[in-house]
């Protein structure tokens, strides 16, 4: 297969976790995709939208739409930003001068695991990752994009990986909707409780589709020297290939 795909890299990944983007590209190329990346690509406007600055979100959203209007699949290593385009952009661009372009980008935008499982029909990427891990569901993934089983299917095929489920895998990490900015103590308390639940269950790794959640967990883990680490789904899927 030689499927040409665009990639959309969230700001957080671009600026702080470029290895996540690189690992996603490796996975896509392993499956035969011809990956395209526009170096002028910027932000989807998610934080501005969540904080009520819809005009600012629309301004950067217009730029993103024009950069991605190629009528090919767009793959994003983060459900939160993919959900902004698929679920929030209608409030900004429906019946606007960019209506047709936004509908095209909305239709073609996929979070990584959703794309791999439901478009590429992939499950076993050939990965090997020695760990007892939890798959943490990002709020946007579950509630807006309805993504829950796709990452678990992919992880179930990873050699030497044992998945552990606890009630906390379905909880908010504590930073959603700007809680980390508006109530830091509560945000940290929520994150700390979840991490401890994972440790008590025997997990040594927290895996997620979203670096937003993982960054929040990682800051708590490092500050308190806790015996657990974080890993983006793309990192796990790109690990241990023969």
Label every PLM stretch briefly.
Residues 1-242:
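Iron-sulfur cluster-binding electron-transfer modules in prokaryotic oxidoreductases
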């Amino acid at each position: 297969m030689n499927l040409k795909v665009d990639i959309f890299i969230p700001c957080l990944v671009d600026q702080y976790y470029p290895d996540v983007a690189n690992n996603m590209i490796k996975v896509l190329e392993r499956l035969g995709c011809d990956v395209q990346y526009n170096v002028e690509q910027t932000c989807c406007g998610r934080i501005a939208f969540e904080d009520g600055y819809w005009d600012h979100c629309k301004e950067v959203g217009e730029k993103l739409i024009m950069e991605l209007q190629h009528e090919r699949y767009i793959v994003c290593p983060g459900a939160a930003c993919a959900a902004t385009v698929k679920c929030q952009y209608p409030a900004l661009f429906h019946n606007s001068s960019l209506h047709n372009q936004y509908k095209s980008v909305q239709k073609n935008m996929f979070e990584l695991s959703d794309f791999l499982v439901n478009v590429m029909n992939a499950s076993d990427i050939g990965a090997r990752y020695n760990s007892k891990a939890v798959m943490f569901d990002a709020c946007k993934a579950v509630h807006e994009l309805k993504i829950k089983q796709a990452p678990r299917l992919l992880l179930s095929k990873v050699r030497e990986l044992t998945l552990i489920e606890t009630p906390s895998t379905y909880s908010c990490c504590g930073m959603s909707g700007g809680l980390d900015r508006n109530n830091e103590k509560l945000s940290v308390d929520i994150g700390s409780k979840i991490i401890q639940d994972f440790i008590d269950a025997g997990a040594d790794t927290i895996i997620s589709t979203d670096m937003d959640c993982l960054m929040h967990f990682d800051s708590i883990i490092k500050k308190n020297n806790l015996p657990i680490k974080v890993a983006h789904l793309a990192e796990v899927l790109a690990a241990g290939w023969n």
